[in-house]
Amino acid sequence: MCAGSACEEITPMRHRYVFSLLLFTIPIAAAGQAKSPMALFPGIELEWKDGPPALPKGAKMAILEGDPTQPGVFTMRLRFPDGFQVFPHWHTQTEHATVIKGTLHLGMGERFERSSTTALVTGSFGYWPAGTKHFAWAEGETILQLHGQGPWTITYVNAADDPRTARP
């Protein structure tokens, strides 16, 4: 036996309303799932290649998602040897960085000054907006994960620091 609103009779109109909602929401949920394929990259299976030409020699990279040279989402890892340096530069998109291994010393500004950097140790995360002038150096072998919107570009503050234009 019921009492009050807990025993309201479910009318045919209410059935149609609930059924219509289900018919509308199930395809939307399924479509969202279809656009999100899963990808796993166990660390030992990454394919490391020479780093992008915009970085000094010695850098290695592994692309996890997308294509950093094209518009759209990308995720890549960069591996730097001990003492690796990237001189002051900026990007056209916001940069998101996570230190996977080692220590990345990051500084802001137009002059490379080791003493004015912040040590980002394993597990550190940071992001900075497009146009932010910054520089970095690695202490120990360092692996950095970058993700964001492509194309990923680097413009050096001092054109002479750009490895793409450096003379042998």
What are these regions (language model features)?
Residues 1-12:
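Short, Lys/Arg-enriched N-terminal segments with co-localized hydrophobic residues
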Residues 11-19:
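Bacterial N-terminal signal peptides that target proteins for export
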Residues 23-31:
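Hydrophobic h-region of N-terminal signal peptides that target proteins for export
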Residues 32-74, 117-118, 159-168:
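A short, N-terminal "cap"/entry segment at the start of jelly-roll beta-barrel domains
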Residues 81-84, 90-111:
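Glycine- and acidic-residue-biased ligand/ion/polar-headgroup-sensing regions
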Residues 86-88, 106-107, 128-129, 133-139:
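Short beta-strand His + acidic residue motifs that chelate non-heme Fe in jelly-roll/DSBH
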Residues 110-131:
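Short acidic-glycine-tyrosine-enriched beta hairpin
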Residues 119, 130-153:
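Ligand-binding loop in jelly-roll beta-barrel domains
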